[in-house]
């Protein structure tokens, strides 16, 4: 949540973000290794930690080390939402991907059981999306978690056991009914579908697209 509420316009998903940098004397706004094993980043050359690493008791301590691995996944999820819905600097009233994912994670916390494991946390977030959108982001959420080893066939074993996690990179089968309402278009995809010009408008606008043939209906909302 600390990373989410300190995001700024222009930040990139691959930027290295540290936690508690001040404790190491790192100036505000600059990245450092901080108090985690690696900075948070979607770039695997910066942060390549996956679910299986949570078994490594020599390097991944508890509670912060284990939480770091799950937070790495949530940071990837944050940027997946920003890619799809855009960024909104208004934390309280905004409707960007950063706003949506923060609410999603909060809703997931309300749904997960006591003493949760990684699978419990993942499934609670999926359930929160199903409850709030009917499952529009199920595919996106699965792709993010599977990319870090928390895939469809992953196992958390006993949530109280540090070394029985099994990672997996598979997605649910396409015929899984929970995926039927998936929306897979990102903001970039949408922008590539059509262009509206001129901007600013002189009272008239033109809409151009290479992907729409024949008649269609367009609704413009200001």
Please state what every model-predicted region is.
Residues 188-222:
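C-terminal outer-membrane/trafficking sorting elements
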Residues 1-182:
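Extracellular protease catalytic domains of secreted zymogens
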């Amino acid at each position: 949540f600390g990373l989410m509420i300190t995001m700024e316009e222009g930040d990139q998903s691959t930027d290295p973000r540290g936690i508690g940098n001040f404790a190491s004397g790192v100036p505000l706004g600059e990245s450092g290794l901080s108090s985690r094993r690696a900075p948070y980043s979607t770039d695997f050359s910066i942060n390549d930690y996956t679910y299986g690493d949570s078994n490594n008791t020599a390097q991944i301590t508890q509670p912060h080390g284990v939480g770091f691995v799950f937070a790495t996944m949530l940071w990837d999820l944050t940027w997946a939402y920003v890619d799809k819905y855009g960024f909104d600097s208004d934390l309280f009233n905004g409707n960007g991907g950063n706003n949506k994912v923060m609410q999603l994670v909060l809703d997931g916390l309300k749904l997960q059981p006591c003493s949760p494991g990684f699978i419990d946390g993942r499934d609670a977030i999926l359930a929160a999306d199903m409850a709030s959108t009917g499952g529009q982001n199920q595919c996106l959420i699965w792709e993010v978690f599977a990319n870090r080893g928390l895939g469809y066939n992953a196992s958390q074993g006993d949530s109280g056991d540090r070394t029985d996690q099994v990672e997996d990179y598979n997605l649910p089968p396409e015929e899984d009914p929970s995926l039927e309402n998936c929306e897979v278009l990102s903001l970039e995809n949408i922008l590539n579908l059509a262009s509206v010009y001129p901007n600013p408008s002189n009272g008239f606008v033109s809409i151009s697209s290479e992907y729409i043939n024949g008649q269609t209906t367009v609704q413009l909302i200001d």
